[in-house]
């Protein structure tokens, strides 16, 4: 890795932002940890930031030469808030931007796909990370994790579709390389784990590793959409349910070598993630 200036991490307490901040600071890089509450992050300088409050943007960008961008959560049109900020960042001297997107959203596609499309014209050095679904969705604060704890059930409209679930630590490791390597990737990177699993497989692995029975219940698209509307805005719920339907049709049944290629090590398996969490909690 090359010596860098200061990296602004937007969403520094989130699933990938917190891990990216931790890996950067552990390697000796300077980090500004941005969030609405400016929550302290070990080894980083906390700074208040709200996508929807432009008054917070200039101070967050002060002294920064690269940014890690996590879009505003649940916003079906993040470009409206993100693109003005990115133009400001470019004017403020930021020369490298790494955007967190999704394997389900192509360049120019819905939601953050519009930001993806704009990024190469704004920054000479850039990358778009397009991870598959996070393994941490089943262990953290995600709706799947909550329903596993509360009901022993994973609810989806994904049927028997398979997904290359990826560990957030591996996403962060790729983000660190994309932010700090001498040459930026200047491309989008689809990030997956080493294998594809159905939600039935996920339930079976959780049951085997934890000893607690977990099952996958399959819902029709409409019921899944309606279930999600109790948790997120209606338009975003429809988009998430559409993603489940795409999984059912095979859209996420793939693996890539991007994690291994960028980090020099293979991605972690879901079983290894659960085994590690069980050891930490015992």
Residue ranges of predicted features:
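Cofactor-binding loops of NAD(P)H-dependent oxidoreductases
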Residues: 47-50
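Helix N-cap at the beta1-alpha1 junction of Rossmann-like dinucleotide-binding domains, i.e.
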Residues: 37-39
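Oxidoreductase cofactor-interface core, primarily capturing Rossmann-like NAD(P)-dependent enzymes
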Residues: 2-33, 42, 52-54, 62-64, ...
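A hydrophobic C-terminal alpha-helical subdomain
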Residues: 221-282
């Amino acid at each position: 890795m090359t010596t860098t200036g200061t990296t602004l991490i937007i969403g520094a307490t989130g699933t990938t932002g917190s891990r990216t901040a931790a890996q950067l600071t552990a390697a000796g890089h300077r980090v500004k940890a941005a969030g609405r509450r400016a929550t302290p992050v070990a080894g980083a300088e906390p700074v208040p930031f709200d996508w929807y409050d432009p008054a917070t943007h200039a101070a967050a960008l002060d002294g920064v030469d690269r940014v890690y961008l996590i879009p505003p959560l649940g916003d079906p049109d993040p470009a409206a808030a993100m693109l003005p900020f990115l133009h400001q960042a470019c004017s403020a001297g930021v020369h490298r931007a790494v955007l967190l997107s999704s394997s389900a959203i192509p360049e120019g596609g819905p939601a953050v796909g519009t930001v993806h499309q704009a990024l190469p014209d704004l920054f000479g050095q850039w990358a778009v990370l397009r991870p598959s679904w996070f393994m941490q969705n089943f262990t953290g604060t995600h709706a799947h994790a909550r329903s596993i704890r509360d009901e022993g059930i994973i609810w989806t409209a994904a049927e028997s579709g398979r997904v290359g679930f990826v560990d957030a630590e591996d996403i962060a490791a790729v983000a660190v390389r994309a932010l700090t390597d001498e040459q930026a990737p200047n491309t989008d990177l689809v990030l997956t784990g080493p294998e594809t699993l159905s939600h039935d497989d996920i339930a079976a692995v959780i049951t085997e590793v934890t000893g607690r029975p977990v099952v996958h219940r399959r819902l029709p698209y409409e019921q899944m959409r309606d279930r999600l509307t109790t948790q997120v805005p209606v338009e975003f719920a429809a988009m998430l349910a559409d993603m489940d339907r795409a999984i059912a049709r095979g859209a996420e049944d793939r693996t890539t070598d991007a994690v291994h290629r960028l980090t020099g090590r293979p991605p972690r398996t879901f079983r290894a993630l659960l085994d590690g969490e069980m050891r930490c909690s015992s």
